[in-house]
Every structure is written in structure tokens, then in C-alpha cells.
């Protein structure tokens, strides 16, 4: 099953974040889509923004990110 890593409600949209370490933003986005995280928030009637972020533990920075609306 799994859970989305972070949810942010701006009042105008719901942002679903999946965070990865030393993988890829694409892997994070794939998890959001494969586990159908947006369906869990359908009753909010807010637009869903999916955000996948990959962190690099060597440089301690965001390596890449991907956003889908």
C-alpha cells in the first residue's frame, strides 16, 4: 500500500510529494502513480499537483524533481 510522504493544502490545490534518496524524480513520480495516491484525496475536490523529488546524499542537495498536474 504505502503512503504519500507529504501533503500540502494551499486552499486552491493539494500538493502530493514523494521523496527519494539517491534514486530519481521519475522513480518518485512512478510511485505516486502506481500506488494511485491522488485517489485517496478525491473527496477534497481540489486540483492535485504531484511532485516527485530526489535528494543526493553525497552533495546534500536536490538532484532532480518532476511536477505533474
Residue positions per predicted region:
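Flexible, glycine/threonine-enriched loop-and-boundary segments that flank and lead into catalytic domains
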Residues: 1-2
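Intrinsically disordered, low-complexity acidic/polar segments
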Residues: 15, 26-28, 44, 59-62
Amino acid at each position: 500500500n504505502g503512503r504519500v510522504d507529504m501533503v500540502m493544502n494551499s486552499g486552491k490545490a493539494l500538493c502530493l510529494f514523494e521523496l527519494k534518496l539517491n534514486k530519481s524524480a521519475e522513480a518518485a513520480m512512478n510511485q505516486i502513480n502506481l500506488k494511485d495516491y491522488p485517489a485517496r484525496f478525491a473527496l477534497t475536490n481540489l486540483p492535485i499537483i504531484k511532485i516527485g523529488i530526489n535528494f543526493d546524499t553525497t552533495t546534500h542537495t536536490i538532484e532532480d524533481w518532476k511536477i505533474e498536474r
